[in-house]
UniProtKB/Swiss-Prot annotation:
It is found in: Mitochondrion matrix. It catalyses: a medium-chain fatty acid + ATP + CoA = a medium-chain fatty acyl-CoA + AMP + diphosphate. ATP binds at residues 229-237, 367-372, 454, 469, 565. It comes from Mus musculus (Mouse). This is Acyl-coenzyme A synthetase ACSM5, mitochondrial. The lineage of its organism: Eukaryota, Metazoa, Chordata, Craniata, Vertebrata.
Amino acid sequence: MRLWLRGLACQALRSSWGVCRIHTQPPPPPIPEVVATWEAISLGRQPVPEYFNFAHDVLDVWSQLEKTGHRPPNPAFWWVNGSGTEVKWTFEELGKQSRKAANVLEGVCGLQPGDRMMLVLPRLPDWWLISVACMRTGVVMIPGVSQLTAKDLKYRLQAARAKSIVTSDALAPQVDAISADCPSLQTKLLVSDTSRPGWINFRELLRAASPEHNCVRTRSGDSVAIYFTSGTTGAPKMVEHSQSSYGLGFVASGRRWMALTESDIFWNTTDTGWVKAAWTLFSAWSNGACIFVHELPRVDAKTILNTLCRFPITTLCCVPTLFRLLVQEDLTRYKFQCLRHCLTGGEALNPDVRDKWKSQTGLELHEGYGQSETVVICGNSRNSTIKSGSMGKASPPYDVQIVDEEGNVLPPGKEGNIAVRIKPTRPFCFFNCYLDNPEKTAASEQGDFYITGDRAHMDEDGYFWFLGRNDDVINSSSYRIGPVEVESALAEHPAVLESAVVSSPDPIRGEVVKAFIVLSPAYASHDPEALTRELQEHVKTVTAPYKYPRKVAFISELPKTVSGKILRSKLRNQEWGR
């Protein structure tokens, strides 16, 4: 079912890419039919289509619109590495290359619809190609960050029963170390210009593959992606999204919160392993915008600012941690000729950061809030009035409320749980379930609502004000870190008798991991500073390095309940002065 082409191909899009549109407003482009479809679904006037595939029903349609002159000539994808190398694809070229990639997945890899492929790559063009190839073949992609250790990879490959993994040279040794323990793993695909024993070289196969491929017919409810999200009481859980929850669900955020059009060039600095990368892919391409990517082997403020000056980027999205770094620079030295819209999310934004950014650039920071389980739940859209410190208003089609512990809706001004109404009608832009964890899926629902686990209050004007989390998950620089994962890593060191991990305030990262440790008797007399460094390095080798405790305190005993459960909340409140 092609959602856009009908009725649009005969309309001419007058706007074209040339100079940046800063002081003038172009004529509004014709609204793509997918937007009308989304609005009809959200209003209950039209059901979610039985069949939907983002690659076929969206990307291939934009390719046709390019051919008929109904889209500006800016690329669909633009990648740079900071050393002079650039990759640009139109939607037509993206279609050609992704069909070749689809043939690689179906051919040599032998993958079929419903099979799962783990995708762990840095910011390389191959990540976007393989993501689209997964959609074309019905293969379910499982993105992961490049900092995963062998232990992390083993757990994810086993839990997801992944049949294939795609990664780069840097992570291949870790995969080799655990692949024998992953019985479902059949093929290992290497994105590299060199070969490695036991691996299939993706780039070699891509060059030789046929550009002809028939996209599989997928149902709207078929799985498109699985994300592992950190929890507080055990191993990361699997969040499953469908073709329609992402493929149709991000039309709204793309047009409203991100304010993207066919003429925009959108840069989100996120890592490919985080859900924000998928948000960008679906939001930008559903609206015909260009996705800009900088390889960013090392993320630093000057690289970001210089890139904004050098390239015609119109829309920028960074986590608050990065904006905290950017405002420490003298922003008056940088001239952003094309930048018109700035977005942030993933953690609370300090009002002073927003004020500093606006005072030096003239641009607002538009905060948004969502989860791995959802799309954008609420946000400050481009033309809305911003209340500094607020996450903005509910994003359609969500009915967002503040509820008490029994699921009763609270009046404005009352603190409670952020909740999304899922009954009598579950929003189509919502995760399917926590895979293989029906208990967790059931526990996330209360009455008519899905409970986010975050607390806030809503004011009389419908703006939401974030207060904190119900759970113990640590949100450091937008990296969600489960305390159990860090505590388990610490427990593998002989110096640690027991530990409790909580968040601790940090002026740059918002919050960081702090470990309270009770030492084994044999280590009680060791030098605290040296032991701290040793434990930090130990955690980095056992789990993803971003999880290591930046702060360590050695104490004689941990606070516990009468039943022996560690009271992380008491330690956390102590850190935050509550």
